[in-house]
Each structure stands twice: as structure tokens, then as C-alpha cells.
Amino acid sequence: MPIEMRSFARSVMNDDERREVEAMEMLADHLRDELVEREVAINQAHVVGAQSTAIQAIVAEVLTDELDFGQEVVLTPQDGIVTRARPDFVFQLSPGRGVMAEVERGGTVNNNHDLKDMWKAYISQDIQHLFLVVPNSNWTGVGGAREKPYPRVINRVGAFFGTPRRESGRPVGPRLRVRAGQPASCG
């Protein structure tokens, strides 16, 4: 299956935010191109019972080695919020501005990992952008598709964008811009 990518951004942005989103486009396009190059390895790693760390290791080759993302970085804590958010990958755009990348697999939708990642990015003062890497399909033991996380993630994440009312609530900075690119699935 092809490696697809979908982007969501706030409906209203100023010029600085637009420029930052353009920089995210370039990062995301590079990530997608590199994942396409690794499609065979991704398909071999994305099998029944595999851990998300198998896919994460492949994505890490691109994010850490080529794009200079940090791995498992603890984000700046905020007053009143009890969390030690530690995304899979983080890239600092400038002081206090960044993008985090999360790789999900089996629990993407069933365990709400996609929404947890949105929440983590939303409450993190250092993060304004989120790349989600999710599978097209997860498989049963006999090789059939058990679920299709990618289209469900697109629908769920897309619900947070499209109108200023749905995008409101964050006091500073642009709302999240989500890249949901997924590993191609096997089968």
C-alpha cells in the first residue's frame, strides 16, 4: 500500500505562522519521501504481534539521523499540569517552538493513542506541530485487515480543524498542525 500523508492546519494564521507551516511542509515531505524509500522494511516490520518500536526504529533513521530530531526528549513541564510528556521524537524550530513526532501501531485508535498524542502536543508549551505516523491497516492472525487506523485518525484529528470555533482554546501560538503519514501495510 502507498504511504499517504494528510495535513491539517488552523484556518486562520498570520504571516509568521504561515512561514512556519511551510517549513513543516518541507520536513513532512522529506519524512514521507524517506518512508517511501523504506517501504519494504516497513512492510516486513509491520506484522501481527510486532511492537510499534519496530516501526519506530525505521522512522528514527530518518528523523534522528537525517532531520536532527531528538528522541524521547522530556518536554518543559507546565504549572498545574501533571505530566512528564516524552514524545517519541522532538525537533526545536526556535526557542519555545517545535514539532513532535509520534509513531503508533496497534493501539492507535482502540487505545486512543492518536488523541493522547494530540493532547500531549496541545498542552506542551514547546510544541506547536505534530507528526503522527500510523498504519493503513492492522492485521489479524490469518492476514485480513483487523482495523484501518489511518482513515479513522484522519477523521478524528480532522474534527479539531476547519473552523475557528473548533480550533480555539489555546492561548498562544498556532493550533496544532498534524501530519498523519503512515507506514504502508503488508498483506
Residue positions per predicted region:
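Soluble or luminal CAZymes and related metallo-dependent hydrolases
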Residues: 51-55, 113, 149-156
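Active-site-adjacent loop/helix micro-motif of nuclease/hydrolase catalytic cores
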Residues: 100-103, 107-117, 142
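Domain-level recognition of nuclease-like catalytic cores that cleave nucleotide substrates
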Residues: 136-187
